[in-house]
Structures are given as C-alpha cells and as structure tokens.
Amino acid sequence: METSEEENFGVAVSSPSDAEFDAVVGYLEDIIMDDDFQSIQRTFMEKHYQEFDDSEENKLIYTSIFNEYISLIEKYIEEKLLDRIPGFNMTAFTMSLQQHKDEMAGDIFDMLLTFTDFLAFKEMFLDYRAEKEGRSLDLSGGLVVTSLNKSSVSSS
C-alpha cells in the first residue's frame, strides 16, 4: 500500500439554497404521502376523470379542471409547507425546481409537473381513467411457461 498518495474522496458540499431545497422536497414527500392529500387528490380525480379521453383534441373543459386542480392541490401543499417552513415562497420554489429537476425523485417530480405541464396533468387523468375502467397495463399474463419437451405435446 502506498502512503505517498492520498485517497481523494469527493464530498458533496451543498449550498444553503440546496439544503433548503432538499428540506422542501423532504416535506413534500411527507405531504403527498399523507392520507389527507391522497384523499383530496383521489376525490378530485374521481369527480372529473370521466371528462378525459385519449383523443388528440383537448376539450375546453380541461382548462377549467386544470385550473381548479392547481388551485386546490397547490394551495393545499403550499399551506402545509408554510406550516413547516415559515415564509415559504411557492413561486421561488417552483423556479428552484426547474434548476434541480434532474435531481428529483420521479414520483414527486411527476406530481409537481402536473401543476405546470398540462400534458402531464392530462396523462395523470387518462391513467386514472384506464385504471378505473380496468384498462390499465396488466403484465401478469406476459409470462408463459412452455415445455420444450416433445413428449409433453399432445397429438391432435
């Protein structure tokens, strides 16, 4: 073992703004996993999912549903974050979110994307509708075991 060479360990040094962002994301995880949030979102989706269809054309009603969703869900999250972080600013966090989007965990980023990306919002409703109607992707029938032994093949 050579003692002349020092091992160089990369240590991630985060700025206060990174630490603040990470704290907000941690709180967000707690909020969206909470039963109250799940209930609010599920109730909203249950109320509106039948309006959505998989056509290329977006109906005018989608806009009002989207705006209602943003108002309801974003307001709920912002209130919960303000309880945990006095002086929290959702607008500043949204801008910070764009800078950190490559670092975000998938589910949280996808959910937050539904506030700003209409197509993500519509896709969420289409997935929910497919699930409600039993059209969700079922991979359980994807694996079939077939014997390669000729003697197990019955003759017709």
Swiss-Prot record:
Task: Quote the cellular component terms of the Gene Ontology held in the record.
Answer: centrosome; cilium; mitochondrial intermembrane space; nucleus; spindle
Query: Quick one: a GO biological-process term for this protein?
Result: positive regulation of tyrosine phosphorylation of STAT protein
A Pfam family for this UniProt protein?
ARL2_Bind_BART
Keywords in alphabetical order: Cell projection, Cilium, Cytoplasm, Cytoskeleton, Mitochondrion, Nucleus
Q: Which InterPro entries match?
A: ARL2BP, BART_dom, BART_sf
Cystine pairs: none
Respond yes or no to whether keyword Nucleus is given for this record: yes
Compartments (UniProt record): Cytoplasm; Mitochondrion intermembrane space; Cytoplasm, Cytoskeleton, Microtubule organizing center, Centrosome; Nucleus
Ribosomal protein keyword on record:
no
Signal sequence interval, chain numbering = none
Gene Ontology terms, MF aspect:
transcription coactivator activity
Family, as annotated: Belongs to the ARL2BP family.
Q: What does this protein do?
A: Plays a role as an effector of the ADP-ribosylation factor-like protein 2, ARL2.
What is the name of the protein in this document?
Answer: ADP-ribosylation factor-like protein 2-binding protein
Organism equals Gallus gallus
